[in-house]
Amino acid sequence: MLIAQRPSLTEEVVDEFRSRFVIEPLEPGFGYTLGNSLRRTLLSSIPGAAVTSIRVDGVLHEFTTVPGVKEDVTDLILNIKQLVVSSEHDEPVVMYLRKQGPGLVTAADIAPPAGVEVHNPDLVLATLNGKGKLEMELTVERGRGYVSAVQNKQVGQEIGRIPVDSIYSPVLKVTYKVEATRVEQRTDFDKLIVDVETKQAMRPRDAMASAGKTLVELFGLARELNIDAEGIDMGPSPVDAALAADLVMPIEELELTVRSYNCLKREGVHSVGELVARSEADLLDIRNFGAKSIDEVKAKLAGMGLGLKDSPPGFDPTAAALGADDDADAGFLETEHY
């Protein structure tokens, strides 16, 4: 059995809707194999929502104008295609827009139903004069990739229903590059960097997760031909190994104050793993272990990327700390670790 070092994936957040994902180390050649597959999947196969057709009051086709509206229907459709929407519905849903001039018509004027959200409300759709009035229905559907207005046209659709081009993909841009990285004495391993930029309807990490799920499903078809076939097995995760080492660490290595240390030892807490299994409420039940001790422990654990277990619902740490014996001398003066 061939065992390779398990790659790790880290995310560098550039802004709310752009991230760089680094996957390393990869066996030589796998950087381009994985990078190309991820890029194509991200650009073409991430589900999303878009407007598929509109119906404007008083309009029969797109090659006309609306009284009191500066933009003609063609320009109106071009603006509508820039709408960023998300929908929880598998079936088509309708949004409504009604606006009386004068003034601008923006995406914020659209009234979406429950389960549908417009993510760029500042988008300008049209300009109305003093006598202008715009009433419109916008049909939203879920899908993948790009679908033209011709494909969106339905047989026997009602008169005045105008199909529009639909860009379902929530991903705007994907680039990747492969660099060399070192593993022990070898310098020919691959480091894959994938830069993902999305619309406001989806975070880059969610798009990346969706692409990964799709690829796993597809490559699983080949695996099912012979589930016992030999391949390259990934070794243990370095993150898991580091976490395991932290959890077995004795609490002596946290370098707590004498009071906190002795309180924990009296309670039978000897390792970091036993400590993180306790909640703040559990620790405040320990005699002489109060708010200052809690803050000290939380700070030490945070430095390791760890934290205490969640307290029960309704737990009030402030009230609990006030009732604790923190820093009350009460004859409790210990100066040795034991």
From Swiss-Prot:
Catalytic reaction list: RNA(n) + a ribonucleoside 5'-triphosphate = RNA(n+1) + diphosphate
Biological processes annotated in GO: DNA-templated transcription
Enzyme class of the recorded protein, top EC level: transferase
EC number: 2.7.7.6
Region entry Alpha N-terminal domain (alpha-NTD), spans: 1-226
Coiled coil: none
Gene Ontology, cellular component aspect: cytoplasm; DNA-directed RNA polymerase complex
GO molecular function: DNA binding; DNA-directed RNA polymerase activity; protein dimerization activity
Region (Alpha C-terminal domain (alpha-CTD)), start-end ranges: 243-338
Quaternary organization: Homodimer. The RNAP catalytic core consists of 2 alpha, 1 beta, 1 beta' and 1 omega subunit. When a sigma factor is associated with the core the holoenzyme is formed, which can initiate transcription.
Protein purpose: DNA-dependent RNA polymerase catalyzes the transcription of DNA into RNA using the four ribonucleoside triphosphates as substrates.
The name this protein goes by in its record: DNA-directed RNA polymerase subunit alpha
Origin organism lineage: Bacteria, Bacillati, Actinomycetota, Actinomycetes, Kitasatosporales
Gene coding for it: rpoA2
